[in-house]
Each structure stands twice: as structure tokens, then as C-alpha cells.
């Protein structure tokens, strides 16, 4: 450990109060000029994920995405995460950039393959050292670290043993989570166990890693949730706030002629994860479907582990799901056979969805799952903007984010218990099977690794400083 790291550790906890200061009794407001103010203590942040930005693929462990992205035909244009944004070597410069852009909280993920390269057994000190340095750098610049423990990057050895379809993976996750907490827990207060387990269980079977169409998907769902529940044991190890991040989408039926389909799709897309984690039971629709797809062992006892208190529910929002009244079914989601969708269910809606869907979703979550604070852990849009010298104009992104934040403000005014917002993403990055074609609020020249803040990054800096939107935005 360096001297600077020891100094930063001695002052541990600096900045953590920002996330701990959740909204209590403070209301969002609109002033006479039409400006929109967010609640006192509202959390403003930005997000990334390890495999999407770190690079350094030959250093400190190999994950399933390293293998998948090197498989011909799996990723657009043959892109890989070998170098990505080279954040592994440039993290200090990136943190200084974030500080200059006014970021207060940074959501990142820890790469499991760097910490426990074989999935179980010895912990890799070099992997922990990297995140140790990253956390100290963040705190040194007044930025609160907000790590996610699993963002789809599974050690390849565990994938070879069955991945999340194997029950043992949940227990290996708990061991890994404890190892990370032992190293970082003296300075990190808030933790997210899993990011978008729906993607790891379903989307991975044909678009993302591992790409195996015969994965027992509902068994993987259950084991991901079990891993989340086992990860919540960090509370007894001293963790402050613990949460789970889900990708959630309102389901819209085209017309009454699609009766019944909407509730079934909502159960598969949303309640399949919400209900076990927050209510201690699976939706009846999912139980019926599971009966034909998975043998879960002892789900009753497992649900006691899965259903433990969480401090925050992270919401990743990009799109709604709209059912069509006509046309052929176009999806590969088990349990939704015969239901027609306006677009394939597995495709993330880029560049950006209608923001009013987010308002609807936040109000529904606060109504159906009271007592759990909400935080938007990802939201953003991708547009085909290009650098023009030292500037990158992206007015479409600014318009989208403005409309989204207005919808978010409306939801708070209507009673949603929303406590924060993380824009996706800080940097252009490796967008999984899409390669490098999606974009963040900071432009990255992948030849020189130069970073150029887009106009949206400067706009977002002003939003954070004002804790709100000006009239006319």
C-alpha cells in the first residue's frame, strides 16, 4: 500500500455521508419561475461497469466476457474489451475528470475474475489492490464510491462448471463479496449485490455471454437471487447500506385484445425478481412457468435467505415493453410463448425511450413495494455524435436527459420515494454485444485514449450544482 493510500485510509468514510443522507421529509419543488428543484440530499451520480471500461484483459484474472468477445461473430464488428477505455491504467486521470465534472457519487463494478480468478479458492491481491487505489482516489477527490459486486463478469472457471445454473455459484459469490468487503469496507458504505440479474439469466442465452441457448434459465434466476440473499450477509460484517439493481420496464398492452399477456410479461420481466427479493415469494405466473423449466431444490428455505431487508432498490431504466395486437410472436423468452411484441424483447431500446414510462414505473414501485427507497442506478441514451476538435455536440442527449429528469421530478412530486439518479455512462465504453457503438457523456478516442467531455457532461454538471433544472430546459 502506498503512503497516499494509507493517508486516505486514515481519513476513511469521507464523502460517505452524501449517500447516507437520504431524503427524509424534504419535498421536491417548482418555484415561481418554473425551475425544478430536487429534494435536499438527492443523490446525483454517474455510472460505469468494470468490463466495459477497464481493459487490461491479460492482467489479474480471466472472465467469461473475455472468452465470449474473442469468439467470432458474437460481438458487433469483432470488438472486444481487451483495452476498452484502459481505465485500469488511467483510473487516476478519470477520477480527476469526474471531479472536474462535478460528480459526487460514482457507481462502478468490481470485476469478480480479478479478485478470485478461479471462482473459488485463493484471493488475488493485485486485483484487490486496484480497487483499493480506485476507492482512495475517489475519496481523495470528494467522490463517494458506490460499488456493484456483480455486473455480469463471471470467472470463466465457474461458467465452465455451469455458471448461474449451478447452485454452487451463489455460494462462491458470497465468498467473493466478503473478500471485497474485507478490503474496502472500512471506506465504502453503500453496496449493490447484483446488476440486472434478468440479463445474466435470460439475455445471455442468445445475445450476451455465455451465449449458450440450453442454459436452464429459471434455475439461473433462482441462483442469482440466492446469491443476492447470501450477499446481504455483508450487513453482519458491517456493511452500511445494501441494495439490488434491476432492469425494470413498464408493460403496455396495445389494446384489450391482448388480455392476460401483459400481466404474464410483467411477471417475467419485473416481478420475477421484485417479488422474491421484496415479498419473499415468486409470482404465481412464474411458478407455473418454472414448473416446466427448472428444479429448484428447496425454494422455500432459499426464499428466507433471498427475502431480507434492502436499503435501496436500484432501477435501471431504458425502455418500456409494448405488446402488439397483431403480427407474429417475435421473442425467445420462456413463458411468453404466443405473446406478440412490437419489438424483440431481448433488444435494449437505444437511443432512448419515452421518459413518461419511467414516471409510471417509479410510482408503481413506490405503491407496490412501500418502505424501500428507490434510486435510478442507470439511465441514458446513445446517439451517433462525433468529436469536432475539442468539442462534442450532443443536443439530442441533453433533450432526452432533460425530459427524463422532468419525469423523475414529476414522480417525486406525486409521491415516489426516489432518492437519487445515476446517468449512464461516464465514458464511452464497450457496450457488450453492441461493441463500441453506444456512447456516454464523455467522448473517448479509442486510438489515443483522449477523453473529451460532451456538452451533455457540462450540462449535467450544472444540473448537479443547482440540484435541479432551469425553466426552459
Curated annotation (Swiss-Prot):
For this protein, the record's InterPro entries field holds: Glyco_hydro_1 (IPR001360), Glyco_hydro_1_AS (IPR018120), Glyco_hydro_1_beta-glucosidase (IPR017736), Glyco_hydro_1_N_CS (IPR033132), Glycoside_hydrolase_SF (IPR017853)
Q: Where does this protein come from, organism-wise?
A: Thermobispora bispora (Microbispora bispora)
Protein name according to UniProt: Thermostable beta-glucosidase B
Which EC main class describes this enzyme?
hydrolase
Q: Which UniProt keywords apply?
A: Carbohydrate metabolism, Cellulose degradation, Cytoplasm, Glycosidase, Hydrolase, Polysaccharide degradation
What family does the Swiss-Prot or TrEMBL record give for this protein?
Belongs to the glycosyl hydrolase 1 family.
Any one GO molecular function term: beta-glucosidase activity
Localisation: Cytoplasm
Amino acid at each position: 500500500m502506498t503512503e497516499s493510500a494509507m493517508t486516505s485510509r486514515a481519513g476513511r468514510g469521507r464523502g460517505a455521508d452524501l449517500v447516507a443522507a437520504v431524503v427524509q421529509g424534504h419535498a421536491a419543488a417548482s418555484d415561481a419561475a418554473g425551475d425544478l428543484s430536487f429534494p435536499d440530499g438527492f443523490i446525483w451520480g454517474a455510472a460505469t461497469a468494470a468490463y466495459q471500461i477497464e481493459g487490461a484483459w491479460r492482467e489479474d484474472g480471466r472472465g467469461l466476457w473475455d472468452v465470449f468477445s474473442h469468439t467470432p461473430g458474437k460481438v458487433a464488428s469483432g470488438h472486444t474489451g481487451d483495452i476498452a477505455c484502459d481505465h485500469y491504467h488511467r483510473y487516476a486521470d478519470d477520477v480527476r475528470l469526474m471531479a472536474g465534472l462535478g460528480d459526487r457519487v460514482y457507481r462502478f463494478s468490481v470485476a469478480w475474475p480479478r479478485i478470485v480468478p478461479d471462482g473459488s479458492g485463493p484471493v488475488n491481491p493485485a486485483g484487490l489492490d486496484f480497487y483499493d487505489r480506485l476507492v482512495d482516489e475517489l475519496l481523495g477527490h470528494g467522490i463517494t464510491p458506490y460499488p456493484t459486486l456483480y455486473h455480469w463478469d463471471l470467472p470463466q472457471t465457474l461458467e465452465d462448471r455451469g455458471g448461474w445454473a449451478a447452485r454452487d455459484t451463489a455460494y462462491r459469490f458470497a465468498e467473493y463479496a466478503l473478500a471485497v468487503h474485507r478490503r474496502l469496507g472500512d471506506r465504502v458504505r453503500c453496496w449493490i449485490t447484483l446488476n440486472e440479474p434478468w440479463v445474466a439469466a435470460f439475455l445471455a442465452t442468445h445475445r450476451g455471454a455465455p451465449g449458450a441457448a440450453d442454459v436452464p434459465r429459471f434455475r439461473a434466476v433462482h441462483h442469482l437471487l440466492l446469491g443476492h440473499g447470501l450477499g446481504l450477509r455483508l450487513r453482519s460484517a458491517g456493511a452500511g447500506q445494501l441494495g439490488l439493481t434491476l432492469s425494470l420496464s413498464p408493460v403496455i398492452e396495445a389494446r384489450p385484445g391482448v388480455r392476460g399477456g401483459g400481466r404474464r410479461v410483467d411477471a417475467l420481466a419485473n416481478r420475477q425478481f421484485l417479488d422474491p427479493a421484496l415479498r419473499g415469494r415468486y409470482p404465481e405466473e412464474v411458478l407455473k412457468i418454472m414448473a416446466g423449466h427448472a428444479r429448484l431444490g428447496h425454494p422455500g428455505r432459499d426464499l428466507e435467505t433471498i427475502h431480507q431487508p434492502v436499503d435501496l432498490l436500484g432501477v435501471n431504466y431504458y425502455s418500456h415493453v409494448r405488446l402488439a395486437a397483431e403480427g407474429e410472436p417475435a421473442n425467445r423468452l420462456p413463458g411468453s410463448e404466443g405473446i406478440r411484441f412490437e419489438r424483440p424483447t431481448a433488444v435494449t431500446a437505444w437511443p432512448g425511450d419515452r421518459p413518461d414510462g419511467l414516471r409510471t414505473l417509479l410510482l408503481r414501485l413506490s405503491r407496490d413495494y412501500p418502505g424501500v427507497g428507490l434510486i435510478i442506478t442507470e439511465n441514458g441514451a446513445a446517439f451517433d455524435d462525433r468529436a469536432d476538435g475539442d468539442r462534442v455536440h450532443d443536443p439530442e442527449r441533453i433533450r432526452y436527459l432533460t425530459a427524463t429528469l422532468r419525469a423523475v421530478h414529476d414522480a417525486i412530486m406525486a409521491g415516489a420515494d426516489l432518492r437519487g439518479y445515476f446517468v449512464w455512462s461516464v465514458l464511452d465504453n464497450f457496450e457488450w454485444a453492441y461493441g463500441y457503438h453506444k456512447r456516454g457523456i464523455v467522448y473517448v478516442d479509442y486510438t489515443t485514449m483522449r477523453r473529451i467531455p460532451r456538452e451533455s457532461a457540462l450540462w449535467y454538471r450544472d444540473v448537479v450544482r443547482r440540484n435541479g433544472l432551469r425553466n426552459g430546459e
